[in-house]
Amino acid sequence: MAAPGGHYSHAVTANGFVFISGQLPITPDGSKLADAPFEQQAEQTLNNVAMALTAAGSSLDRLVQVRVYVTDIKSWPAFNAIYAKWVGSSRPARAVIPVPELHYGFKIEVEAVALAG
């Protein structure tokens, strides 16, 4: 995955949990998908969450909470379908929060908390 864009880590482990910083639709080579359709942005963002979890020694089935920020709440049905396929049978706590805008003009950002190990 691409290096963090600021003074932070993609993932931090503390007290048995892995905290995943807000992930954006940026490809591993650093390409920003701001002009891509929402669905493509969502898939890349969730892939970044999965990569950060793996790098921290955790996995999707250990997710506890997921926070999703979207710039258009009308994207909720599309996101929910992509998310359900991505997370599988796991059902962590989740919030989808509409926001007026995100960095670089992205349409989605996702942060998460998982159990370590």
What are these regions (language model features)?
Residues 1-117:
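Short, polar/acidic, helix-capping and beta-turn segments at strand->helix junctions
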